[in-house]
């Protein structure tokens, strides 16, 4: 009896597990826990017969003075725990690296060919066949090594044990796997593999476990690490990552089918539902929906990293609906702001309103309805096709979106040459902030209540939505404080003229000299107004469904951190768009999710 193997876990395997768990705990979802539990169970069930055979045939052994002595099918319990802890660590690392991804956008496979063949791009079918051939070749090689026996036995047992799983995983999800960003797959494989190579080297040198001579090829990756051991940890981590990726593929299928429907599916799917869907569902998708979804995600990443990372804390259909809502609002804003003249901007407002009218008339048709899609796209300009089509009209009221367009009309009233500046008073500022941000916040809460109904009165629900409008204004005030210089460059001043007059300034003076030090106290005043709105709405968040309180609070808190960064850099933020570091955003979101 000994503690050597147990101490390997205490020193090397448990610390990263605890660290990753603590870092990720506020963001854990019930479905993610179920995925990891299932994968750990599969790992134990699949590995026990194989490992038991290795021990019984003396390919692998454990000195009596390095283990506690309790076994399961002759496998030390410390070894069984290794199956669990390795699977847990690798799975959790993969989940963390892929939390930000919007999974359905990867369902159709790579958007660009991965390689060129002799006769042109390699098709998806060819990619599938090549991968299947590769993993089948590994199986044949493993069986051959077992047949040869002797020093090739352990190597053959590893290859023949792992390859059937890899073949199955590849055939079922090769498109999804190839579409994922390469780093999101290979980093969660490489990091734990390298780490376990080091741990295994130390254990082999100490004699904690032993590969019997005559069953290994006696090639070492480096001193103390047998090539079989290096291969074992590599292929097992590949299996784990492919396994959790397969569950993500199943979740992506569920989210896609929910998103294209006209109903709200707030409940988290069970593992059984995901497995059934994964094994039985057709792999035919509406390419328009998937392309538009990818465009919406790209737009969100480019325009607002805070909102992109914040969206990752929401789950399933709700997250997709929020991204689609943001896509329409952002696209409309960009078309109007980037218009070369006022008439073109007015044209785009009219077209946005037209797109809304038509989309809400078609709200009871699914997104993959070809006839409805053609009717919509024939009636509105091409730049609005994707944003209007994805809009979850069946789960939203139209009025706030029309109010948003009215806010854009306020922007058109700015005219430096004529001395026209519509934000004359603090009330004007509040009205503007409501139109361009309060409306969007209210739509977010409408989606929340559609997906996750709660037992509150209609009056209470409306009060919470009203508080959401105030929160939206807080975010807009923060934007205004941040973008004084950038807004002045396009002839806009959102600081009320009455406030400017108190400092002896006019809107025209701000446009001419947007870095005037007299603007610093006014910027503080706007931030104070933002903070006041933020504080007023905190109690209302507790009335939201429990599973979205954390994500809403974290998203808003992380965004409001912009205001704190502005205060810390009052004289240094005139040039360019202020950025909040990822670590700082993560810290604020982590604390808010607790």
Curated annotation (Swiss-Prot):
Q: Tell me, what's a Pfam family for it? A: SQS_PSY
Q: What reaction gets catalysed by this protein?
A: all-trans-lycopene = gamma-carotene; gamma-carotene = all-trans-beta-carotene; 2 (2E,6E,10E)-geranylgeranyl diphosphate = 15-cis-phytoene + 2 diphosphate
Q: Please provide one cellular component term from the Gene Ontology annotations of this protein.
A: membrane
Superkingdom is Eukaryota
One molecular function GO term is: lycopene beta cyclase activity
Q: Provide the E.C. number(s) assigned to this enzyme.
A: 5.5.1.19, 2.5.1.32
| Function recorded in the entry | Bifunctional enzyme that catalyzes the reactions from geranylgeranyl diphosphate to phytoene (phytoene synthase) and lycopene to beta-carotene via the intermediate gamma-carotene (lycopene cyclase).
Q: What is this protein called?
A: Bifunctional lycopene cyclase/phytoene synthase
**Species of the source:** Arthroderma gypseum (strain ATCC MYA-4604 / CBS 118893)
């Amino acid at each position: 009896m000994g503690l050597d193997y147990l101490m390997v876990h205490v020193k090397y395997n448990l610390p990263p597990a605890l660290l990753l768990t603590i870092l990720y705990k506020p963001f854990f979802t019930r479905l993610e826990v179920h995925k990891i539990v299932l994968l750990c169970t599969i790992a134990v069930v699949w590995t026990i017969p194989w490992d038991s055979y290795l021990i019984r045939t003396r390919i692998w052994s454990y000195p009596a003075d390095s283990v506690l002595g309790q076994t399961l099918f002759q496998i030390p319990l410390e070894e069984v725990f290794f199956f669990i802890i390795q699977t847990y660590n690798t799975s959790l690392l993969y989940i963390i690296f892929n939390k930000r991804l919007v999974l359905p956008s990867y369902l159709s496979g790579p958007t660009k060919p991965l390689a060129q063949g002799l006769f042109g791009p390699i098709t998806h079918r060819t990619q599938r066949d090549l991968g299947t051939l590769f993993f089948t070749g590994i199986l044949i090689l493993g069986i051959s090594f077992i047949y040869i026996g002797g020093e090739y036995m352990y190597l053959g047992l590893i290859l023949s044990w792992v390859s059937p799983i890899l073949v199955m995983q590849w055939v079922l999800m090769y498109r999804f796997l190839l579409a994922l960003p390469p780093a999101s797959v290979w980093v969660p494989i490489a990091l734990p593999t390298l780490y376990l190579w080091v741990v295994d080297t130390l254990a082999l040198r100490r004699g904690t476990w032993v590969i019997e001579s005559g069953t290994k090829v006696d090639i070492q990756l480096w001193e103390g690490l047998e090539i079989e051991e290096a291969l074992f940890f590599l292929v097992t981590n590949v299996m784990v990552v492919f396994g959790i990726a397969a569950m993500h593929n199943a979740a992506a299928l569920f989210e896609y089918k929910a998103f294209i429907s006209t109903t709200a599916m707030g409940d988290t799917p069970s593992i059984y539902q995901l497995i059934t869907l994964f094994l039985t569902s057709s792999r035919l998708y509406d390419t328009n929906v998937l392309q538009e979804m990818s465009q919406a995600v790209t737009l969100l990443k480019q325009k607002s990293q805070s909102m992109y990372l914040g969206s990752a804390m929401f789950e399933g259909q709700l997250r997709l609906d929020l991204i689609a809502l943001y896509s329409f609002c952002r696209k409309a804003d960009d078309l109007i702001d980037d218009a070369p003249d006022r008439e073109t901007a007015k044209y785009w407002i009219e077209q946005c309103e037209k797109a809304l009218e038509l989309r809400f008339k078609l709200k009871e048709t699914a997104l993959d309805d070809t006839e409805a899609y053609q009717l919509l796209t024939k009636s509105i300009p091409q730049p609005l096709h994707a944003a209007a089509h994805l809009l979850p009209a069946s789960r939203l009221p139209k009025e706030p979106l029309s109010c948003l367009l009215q806010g854009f009309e306020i922007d058109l009233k700015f005219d430096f040459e004529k001395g026209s500046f519509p934000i004359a008073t603090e009330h004007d500022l509040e009205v503007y902030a409501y139109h361009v941000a309060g409306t969007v916040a209210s739509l977010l809460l409408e989606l929340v209540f559609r997906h996750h109904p709660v037992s509150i009165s209609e009056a209470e629900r409306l009060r919470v939505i009203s508080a959401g409008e105030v929160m939206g204004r807080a975010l807009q005030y923060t934007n205004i404080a941040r973008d004084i210089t950038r807004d002045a460059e396009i002839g806009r001043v959102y600081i009320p003229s009455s406030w400017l007059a108190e400092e002896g300034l006019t809107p025209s003076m701000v446009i001419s000299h947007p870095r005037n030090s007299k603007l610093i106290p006014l910027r503080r005043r706007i931030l104070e107004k933002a903070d006041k709105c933020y504080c007023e709405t905190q109690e209302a968040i507790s009335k939201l469904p429990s599973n979205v309180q954390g994500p809403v609070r974290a998203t808003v808190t992380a965004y409001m951190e912009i205001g704190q960064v502005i205060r810390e850099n009052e004289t240094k933020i005139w040039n360019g768009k202020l950025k909040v570091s990822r670590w700082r955003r993560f810290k604020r979101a982590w604390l808010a999710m607790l």
